């Protein structure tokens, strides 16, 4: 990278920051925009409320008409008492409403909520609904309108029955397992004549509000998605925007998930979710207590004879990799669910690192009962031990170039003009070749470490084991740790300062200074001048990291801080244990050996030599013309 390129990067960064600052609205403009936004939000909410009231009125009118229609098939089930019945085990407590027959509440045991309660409420009241709509020849059955009669009610089982006038029944059977799965069977009995002969699919509407469960609204919102798994493919999610997202799915789907950062509601039909399902994600206002509203409209298999019930499993639980992996074994359906994909582990190569290394090491350390902060430190130490040979190789390559610097200065002092840059480079490469030193020897090992850095970037924010865990001054490793907070949002910063983010950025600056000093000792001529420009970019990166990571999990910032500390310690130890005189003696011996038995130039050196020869020929031709 030459001087002009570095200056170009710095200027581009300056232009971007300058433009961002310039276009930033003034306080008056912000106030005016807030007022305008408030007006628009009020109008939008008013329109939404009016639309909802209109739909509600139509439904109530239709329900009232149905209740008054004594000839309706399920006339008797249109009136009744709404009871909230409980299913529970040691990990999950569900509430089932007899009006509509759906799971109206889910409480996950052993996980604290944002208010500090020991059991987390995933949803309650009208926050989530599941509605089955069965189309008949002359009439429709809508489970949301029906009152079901409960029977066979235990902690793990519940049968809900809606009686038809002709003696037929619509039966919902719930069966709660030992963990987070509940099985639901929907069966029509004695209703065969009600449906058309070719009726084979039931329409389902699943709607839910995603609660804000964590402290940071913006950070948690990034991981709240309506996720689905395409049949015979990987999972995906509908694109998130600030506006309503409504996407038709033109393919069959294995399961749907209303996903939050650490918890999910998942619906898994035994049959496929038919193509052309409609999925919607509606962002909610900050401060409302909700992140998004999810709506899924789809079809799945239905047997009107009642011989085979429409069956599905519902998962209400944590986004824990091992727990989700076990769902494949617990689920009785013949499907490859891969629900562990709800825990995002990064791009393919990064996912492999997290899938086959990070998770197992993390779980192994966790089972010993260590504090999660200690676990992060131990993982850092293990990763540093694994990558130590690469780091040492990189350092030794730099050390060799450092001890050869006087010889490089001597060999290249005659090439001071800009037009001599190619000759200077050739002289340096020739000297490196004679001493058996590769100038690129320190680059590849460092590049190999990058996937590990990115892997932890994806793993830590999704590790539910860090949720609610404290360490030192950090009250919760899964969210930011504010050293100071204020009520208003400041551009690029937010409404707080994270202490671990500050420590990470300060450590980054100190480590950059340490690295730059070491690299300066091995630079020659123009390279040394370029290094002066490069150091400003190195100082700029921590500033950019501050704006990026101020809202991130304290556990991630703490990991990067500890990682930089160990990197600096390793570099210091290597510097203290490297004897420059002995290293130079080894290189001199290699120089004599190579001089006595010259080796063929490497590919890079050969190409540079060819380029040098071509440059010299062109120079001679230009001089001959003049």
Predicted regions located by residue number:
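Short, Gly/Pro- and small/polar-rich lid/capping loops
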Residues: 48-82
């Amino acid at each position: 990278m030459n001087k002009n390129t570095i200056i170009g990067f710095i200027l581009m960064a300056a232009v971007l920051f300058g433009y961002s600052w310039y276009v930033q609205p003034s306080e008056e403009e912000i106030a005016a925009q807030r007022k305008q936004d408030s007006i628009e939000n009020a109008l939008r909410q008013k329109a939404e409320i009016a639309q909802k009231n209109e739909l509600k009125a139509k439904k109530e009118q239709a329900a009232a008409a149905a209740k008054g229609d004594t000839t309706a098939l399920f006339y008797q089930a249109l009136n009744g008492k709404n009871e909230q019945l409980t299913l529970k085990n040691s990990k999950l407590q569900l509430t089932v409403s007899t009006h509509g027959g759906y799971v109206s509440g889910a409480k996950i045991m052993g996980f604290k909520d944002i208010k500090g309660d020991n059991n987390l409420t995933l949803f309650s009241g009208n926050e989530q609904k599941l509605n089955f709509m069965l189309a008949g020849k002359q009439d429709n059955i809508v489970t949301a309108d029906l009152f079901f009669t409960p029977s066979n009610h235990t902690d793990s089982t519940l049968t809900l029955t809606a009686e038809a006038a002709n003696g037929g029944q619509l039966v919902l059977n719930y069966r709660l397992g030992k963990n987070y799965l509940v099985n639901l069977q929907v069966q029509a009995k004695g209703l065969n004549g009600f449906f058309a002969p070719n009726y084979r699919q039931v329409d389902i509407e699943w709607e839910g509000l995603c609660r804000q469960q964590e402290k940071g609204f913006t950070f948690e919102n990034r991981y709240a998605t309506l996720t689905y798994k395409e049949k015979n493919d990987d999972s995906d999610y509908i694109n998130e925007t600030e506006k309503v997202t409504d996407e038709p799915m033109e393919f069959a789907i294995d399961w749907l998930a209303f996903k939050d950062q650490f918890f999910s509601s998942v619906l898994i039909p035994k049959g496929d979710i038919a193509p052309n399902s409609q999925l919607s994600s509606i962002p909610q206002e900050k401060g409302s207590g909700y992140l998004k509203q999810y709506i899924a409209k789809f079809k799945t298999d239905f047997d009107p004879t009642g011989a085979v019930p429409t069956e599905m499993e519902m998962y209400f639980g944590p986004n824990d990799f091992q727990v989700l992996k076990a769902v494949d074994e617990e689920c009785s359906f013949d499907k490859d669910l891969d629900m562990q994909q709800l825990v995002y582990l990064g791009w393919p190569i990064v996912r492999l690192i997290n899938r086959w290394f990070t998770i197992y090491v993390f779980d192994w350390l966790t089972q010993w009962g260590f504090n999660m902060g200690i676990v992060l430190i131990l993982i850092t130490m293990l990763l540093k031990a694994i990558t130590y040979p690469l780091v040492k190789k990189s350092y030794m390559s730099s050390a060799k170039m450092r001890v050869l610097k006087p010889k490089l200065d001597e060999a290249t002092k005659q090439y001071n003009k800009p037009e001599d840059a190619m000759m200077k480079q050739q002289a340096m490469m020739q000297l490196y070749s004679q001493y058996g030193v590769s100038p690129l020897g320190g680059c590849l090992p460092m590049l190999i470490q990058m996937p590990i850095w990115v892997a932890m970037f994806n793993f830590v924010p999704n590790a539910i084991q860090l949720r609610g865990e404290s360490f030192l001054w950090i009250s919760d490793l899964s969210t930011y740790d504010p050293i100071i907070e204020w009520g208003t949002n400041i551009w690029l910063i937010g409404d707080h300062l994270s202490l671990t983010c500050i420590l990470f950025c300060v450590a980054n600056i100190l480590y950059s200074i340490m690295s730059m000093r070491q690299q300066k000792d091995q630079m020659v001529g123009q390279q040394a001048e370029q290094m002066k420009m490069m150091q400003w970019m190195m100082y700029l990166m921590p500033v950019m990291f501050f704006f990026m990571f101020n809202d991130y999990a304290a556990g991630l910032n703490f990991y990067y801080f500890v990682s930089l500390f160990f990197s600096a310690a390793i570099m210091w130890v290597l510097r203290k244990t490297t004897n420059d005189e002995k290293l130079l003696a080894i290189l001199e011996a290699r120089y004599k050996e190579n001089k006595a038995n010259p080796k063929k130039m490497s590919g890079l050196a050969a190409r540079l030599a060819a380029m040098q020869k071509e440059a010299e020929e062109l120079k001679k031709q230009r001089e001959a013309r003049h």
